[in-house]
Structure formats: C-alpha cells, structure tokens
Amino acid sequence: MRLRNLEHNENAKKKEIIVYCSENWNCSNNALRKLFFRSSFHLRGPLAWLALSLSRKIKIFHSFSSIANRNLPIDRAGLLTKQLTMLKFSNEEVCKGQSFLASCEIKSRFVCLHVRDSAYLTTTMGQQRKKHDYRDSEIKTYVAAAESLAEMGYTVFRMGAIVKEPLVSDNPRIIDYAANGMRTELLDIFLGAHCTFTISTGSGWDSVPTVFRRPIMFVNQLPVYAPSVTTLQSVTFPKILLDNQTGSILSLKNLIDREIAHRANSQAYKDAGVEIRDLSSEELVEAVTEMAQRVEGTFVETPEQKEMQAKLKHILSTHQKLQPSPNYYPIRAQFASCFLSRYPNFLHGLD
C-alpha cells in the first residue's frame, strides 16, 4: 500500500485522490492500521464494493487497479529512497513511545532484533506451516550477537508478537520485549520506526523499519535472490546452502542451475537436493558487527571485498534466469562483506 501511494506521488501530473477499497480491514497490527487510515482515504464493506463498481464504469474516475494479488512489495523505482515516509505518529503516540524508552533507561541507540520461528503461523493459522520452515531460526544462536551489540553500547529489543522460546541473557541491555510482557501493538511500530537499525531474518514486520526508512540487515535470509529484498538498500547474510549428498557448499551458479536461488518453499529445497544450514553464532556476531560499523560510518571494505561486491551486483542485475531483462529489478542491496570473505566460492563459475 505504501509503495502504491509513492508510485502515485511520483507519477501524478495533476491533483488526484487515491481511494483504497476493501471488503474488510483485518490487520495483524491495529496501531499500524491507524497510521494508514490517518494518511490515506479508505472505504470498506458495502460502500467499498459500490465504489469499486462505479470506478469501473464512470469516466470521472481516472483509473482502477487491484492490489489484491500483489503479495510482495517490490520497489523497482527506488521510491523508498527518494521520498520520506507518509506515516506520522500522533503527539500522544510519540509520548507513549518516549515514555517507554525512558522507562528502559534508553537515551540514544537501540537495535530491533526480529528472529522468525514457527510460533506465529502455528498459532494464528491453527496448523504447522511447513512451507515456511526454511525461513525459521533458533533464537539461542543470536544471544552472542545481541551481547556483542550491547558491548558496543546498543540496547537490543527482541521483537515479535508470538515467539516460540525466550531470549536468555543476563545483559541488562538485552530486552526480550517479545516475551517479557512489555509488548504492545503501538510499541511494535514505534520501536521499528525509531531504532538505529534492525537485524531481521525476513518477515512481515520488516515492513515497519522499511516504511520508516531505518537501516536493515537480513541474516539467515532465504531465498538468496528475492527482488522484494534486493531492491531495498539493505545488507544480507543468507543461510548457507549445501548439496545434501556431498555436503559441499553450493555456489550461486549451483543455485541458479538448480533453479533454487529464488524459490520460497521448503519443499522446493528438498526436491532440489539442498540442505539448509543456519548461520553459526560466530557468523551472526560478524554480521551484526559489520552492520553496526556500516551504520556508524566506520566500516572499511577491502579491495577484494569491493571487487566481489561489484561482481555480485553485476550477476544479480543481468543474469537472464534472475531478471526478465537487465536491471529490471535494480539491485540496491549488498551482501555482507564478511559473507563474501567467508565464502568466496559463492561467486565461482559466473562472470
């Protein structure tokens, strides 16, 4: 929805009004829905269906389009980097958010950590969603990374509406917001909108820091190539994919040849003979350290890393099995330099 508004603002030659129509406005977060309603004009129920019917028939309406089947927001035009967010918190909401931060004795920098597991879909959908298992991680592997960020002076909020296990750490700068009773729907949005940066494994909540233009790093991210991620100005350290017969780490060329580089289904990886390995605690520490340095402006890439970044961007921008045409989905994301240094064979076999 946010991208639809930005596309409109970018292309509009005369004053127009966008009207969103829906049978219902079920939403996973009511605080976010309030922000949307505050910034856009919406109709719902029978009135919405009447408006939709009229928009198809009467020429006074400039255009009609459906966003019902737009499952993934892909920012081809780079509008998220060109324009400021249209969502605004009320004074009351800002006061509540600031009071919460003050109660946690947070005066400056904090990071949101969101680690996907099976609990949310199992609880909300009423069944185990095996299709998405490949995206899950174990929160215990992130403890060392969170503690590393805390040592750098950041407070770390573990995010999530429904989580499988607690984040266990004695460090007072690490707050298991998702499991300790602090969580509210407003704070879900406020924290994502005001964090110094976000570390996430890829989920619906990522839209919050994205919409509010907060820096984001995706760790344990799959698929390796996803236009909804690679068109963002983000940093990625993907899960490690191996041949399930030989145990050898698969290169990007291997993934493309097996038609698995872009697949978003657990069964697809099994059918392709691919084993998925989550990042180790050590790798996660490297990843978040690099992200903190990038945000702080202290990160320095080696000449070899710069060369690998350029090569990878060229491949992702032009490969005919990844792009309908060259640069159709502009590559604005970078892969973590520590990933490229650890796995230089990832780029072997491709020019």
Positions of the model-derived regions?
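Active-site and donor-binding regions of nucleotide-sugar-utilizing enzymes
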Residues: 1-66, 161-163, 177, 181-182, ...
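Short, solvent-exposed loop/turn segments at secondary-structure junctions
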Residues: 24-26, 116-120, 162-165, 204-206, ...
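Catalytic core of nucleotide-activated saccharide and alditol-phosphate transferases
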Residues: 32-101, 121-127
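Short, well-ordered alpha-helix to beta-strand connector turns
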Residues: 37-39, 153, 194-195, 212
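Leloir-type glycosyltransferase catalytic cores
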Residues: 65-98, 103, 232-351
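Conserved donor-binding/catalytic core segment of Leloir-type glycosyltransferases
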Residues: 108-130
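Catalytic donor nucleotide-activated moiety binding site of glycosyltransferases and closely related
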Residues: 113-121, 139-184, 303-312
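A donor-sugar binding/catalytic signature common to diverse glycosyltransferases
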Residues: 188-234
